[in-house]
Amino acid sequence: MTDFVIEQILSPQECTDIIALGKHNGVKKEDNIVNSNDVGVDKSIRSTEIYFLNDVSLYQKIMPHVVRLNKWNYKFSRVEPLQLGIYREGDHYDWHVDDDGVSYDNSAGPFAGLNRLLSFSILLNEEFEGGEFVINNVLPLNKTGQILLFPSTIKHKVNPVTQGTRYSLVGWCCGELWR
């Protein structure tokens, strides 16, 4: 069994619409990854522009596919706000995991006590070079509208974009560990 699932779920027009929605209605996040001393942004780990989307119709379009493709049978109870990532020339996200086994603390509101169980990334365009999504030394995403679904504990990265702009939509399904 592979560590990820990939499938075409959105049309190119739907992807273009998501990009526009994110740029116009998304909530921009200014800072990304801070260094180990929590002082400043560490762009050597991640350099990208981020917009959070909490659009109900977007969840209704994507989540049935996530549920259907969940071959690991994770029991998740919440989905974090979707994140539009804009990677311009030179932008990247170094090797990381989306969940390190430490549950969200009480300051996380409805996510308190939960962990990221399942991660997904949807490629929204192909008009860029570099910027490959890498998981287990495989470059699985290469078509607009493809979703990549994988356990949140698997290491992955986005290589630096060398030309153009890469757009992706990512999300995380959260729940209690070992359920």
Named regions from a protein language model:
Residues 1-147, 153-179:
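Fe(II)/2-oxoglutarate oxygenase catalytic core
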